[in-house]
Amino acid sequence: MAIARTGVYVDDYLEYASTFPAELQRLLNTVRELDERSQSLINQTRQQTKYCLGLASQSSKKGNGNHYNNGGLDEEETIEKMRKEIESSQENALSLCTEKVLLARQAYDLIDSHVKRLDEDLNNFAEDLKQEGKIPPDEPSVLPPLPIVPKAEKRKSFYGTPQPKKIDYRDRDWDRDRDFELMPPPGSNRKDLMPIEEQPIDPNEPTYCVCHQVSFGDMIACDNENCQGGEWFHYTCVGLTPETRFKGKWYCPTCRLLPQSH
């Protein structure tokens, strides 16, 4: 009976996962395409900014050395036109990066759903083995899980989160807010997923923060790339709220004690 049921579980899962490789490949290819396009825009704005600053410097020298500014109006018009082009390119690049993050979240959720389905089938198969006396009744219902997310994974990974609030990029401190809106903490929407009945917490689920718990709710990332204090931190654990969150460089309690954080 157990052997027959094994075949059923395998066939069902293979059918369920039949479109998985193509879907994942499509998402990753799109992410790569968006990354190339956004990087091209970033390089373009970098060159435009450099040229614009050089033009402004030359205009300033001409103004200081002469009582008249020959061609100054043309240079100002050129600088203003280029400034608008730079702003437009930045907005387009930011839009592409946001789309890239959303696709990366979809890819993670896709992988996560297949892993959960596999865990569920393994649990059901283990229960069948118990009923047939193939394994002891007190054997854990979950078979040893395969590692999904390496614990050494760094904080800048993209994972699924609830839908972010609409961002007004012109009024925000991009360097700080990108950690909140575009680079949310790993797996923070898992509280919304229905867990498999009676399944214990996956021991491979990464833990963060000073509380050493899994990610959930609003979290903030430490700006120390080599953070050893938890990498991502729940607002409540570090005394933050969405209204009082820190703008600028933010370091966790552990990294604040390091010299380079000052």
Swiss-Prot record:
Expression sites by tissue: Ubiquitously expressed.
Pfam families: ING, PHD
Zn-finger segments (PHD-type): 206-258
Molecular function (Gene Ontology), one example: histone H3K4me3 reader activity
SUPFAM superfamilies: FYVE/PHD zinc finger
Binding site for Zn(2+) 1: 209, 211, 234, 237
Marked site (Histone H3K4me3 binding) residue numbers: 208, 219, 223, 232
Subcellular location(s) per record: Nucleus
Residues binding Zn(2+) 2: 222, 227, 252, 255
GO CC aspect terms: nucleus
UniProtKB keywords: Chromatin regulator, Growth regulation, Metal-binding, Nucleus, Transcription, Transcription regulation, Zinc, Zinc-finger
Domain of life: Eukaryota
Quaternary structure and interacting proteins, as annotated: Interacts with H3K4me3 and to a lesser extent with H3K4me2.
Protein role: Histone-binding component that specifically recognizes H3 tails trimethylated on 'Lys-4' (H3K4me3), which mark transcription start sites of virtually all active genes.
Similarity comment text for this entry: Belongs to the ING family.
Domain notes: The PHD-type zinc finger mediates the binding to H3K4me3.
Protein name as catalogued: PHD finger protein ING2
Lineage: Eukaryota, Viridiplantae, Streptophyta, Embryophyta, Tracheophyta
